[in-house]
């Protein structure tokens, strides 16, 4: 059975991937974002209009990568990216999306506009390093996601959730969760329809060290697998 990680374990594994196994951030981000886009296609292939909400960190980078691949898969993604970073990696990811004619919104639509204009929301705002409370600049988007009737797909962690203890009062309730590397403890509280595992890049020795039991879940060349 796949093991669920504490917040500190997730941080430690990430650091080992970078420092011991010499993965680069953009390597892992590309693999993670690709696996997310494939999982989304598997569950929502009949939809077209997708809004990808990106935060300022690695989770947001995963969202930008996913948006690019979703475009290639025939979807019509738009991106809401309220707090951009000046790091070259994120600037390049943004440039790639713009070069593929992916629209970037200046403001988050209200819940009614969201229902009229989009069929799926990809939540790539906060990752496993998140600690409450939500910062003021993200309160508006979190309120909209909480009220929206459009199904939400959360990447790794449903934004605003405690990484180990799950959903706060009035938190978002995603229809889909894509856990990356390995599920975090909050995934035990996920009650949506689809739970996928993505990010197939963990070396066997690292998997054994943390007793993750993840690589056996995958088959063939799949880079994501349904857990629920």
Swiss-Prot record:
A Gene Ontology cellular-component term: mitochondrion
Cofactor note (record): Binds 1 potassium ion per subunit.
Residues binding (6S)-NADPHX: 58-62, 127-133, 156
EC number: 5.1.99.6
Pfam families, A to Z: YjeF_N
Cofactor(s) needed by this chain: K(+)
Top EC group: isomerase
InterPro entries: YjeF_N_dom, YjeF_N_dom_sf, YJEFN_prot_NAXE-like
Binding site for K(+): 59, 123, 159
Record-annotated YjeF N-terminal domain positions: 10-214
Reaction catalysis annotation: (6R)-NADHX = (6S)-NADHX; (6R)-NADPHX = (6S)-NADPHX
GO molecular function terms attached to this record: metal ion binding; NAD(P)HX epimerase activity; nucleotide binding
Cross-referenced SUPFAM superfamilies: YjeF N-terminal domain-like (SSF64153)
Record key words, sorted: Isomerase, Metal-binding, NAD, NADP, Nucleotide-binding, Potassium
Family matches, as PANTHER family: NAD(P)H-HYDRATE EPIMERASE
Function: Catalyzes the epimerization of the S- and R-forms of NAD(P)HX, a damaged form of NAD(P)H that is a result of enzymatic or heat-dependent hydration. This is a prerequisite for the S-specific NAD(P)H-hydrate dehydratase to allow the repair of both epimers of NAD(P)HX.
Family assignment from sequence similarity: Belongs to the NnrE/AIBP family.
Protein name: NAD(P)H-hydrate epimerase
Species, as recorded: Pediculus humanus subsp. corporis
């Amino acid at each position: 059975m796949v093991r669920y990680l504490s917040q500190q374990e997730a941080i430690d594994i990430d650091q080992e991937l970078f420092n011991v196994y010499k993965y680069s951030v953009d390597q892992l981000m590309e693999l993670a974002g690709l696996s997310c886009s494939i999982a989304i296609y598997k569950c929502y292939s009949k939809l077209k209009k997708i809004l990808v909400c990106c935060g300022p960190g690695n989770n947001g980078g995963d969202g930008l990568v996913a948006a690019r691949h979703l475009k290639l898969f025939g979807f019509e993604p738009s991106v809401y990216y309220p707090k951009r970073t000046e790091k070259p990696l994120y600037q390049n990811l943004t440039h790639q999306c713009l070069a593929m004619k992916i629209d970037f919104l200046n403001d988050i639509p209200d819940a009614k506009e969201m229902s009229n204009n989009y069929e799926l929301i990809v939540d790539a705002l906060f990752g496993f390093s998140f600690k409450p409370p939500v910062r003021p600049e993200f309160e508006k988007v979190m309120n909209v996601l909480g009220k929206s009737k459009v199904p939400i797909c959360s990447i790794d962690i449903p934004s605003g959730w405690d990484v180990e203890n799950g959903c706060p009062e009035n938190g978002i309730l995603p229809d889909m969760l894509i856990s990356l590397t390995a599920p975090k403890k909050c995934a035990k509280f996920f009650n949506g329809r689809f739970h996928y595992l993505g990010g197939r890049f963990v070396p066997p020795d690292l998997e054994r060290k943390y007793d993750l039991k993840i690589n056996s879940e995958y088959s063939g060349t799949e880079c994501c697998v349904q857990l629920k």
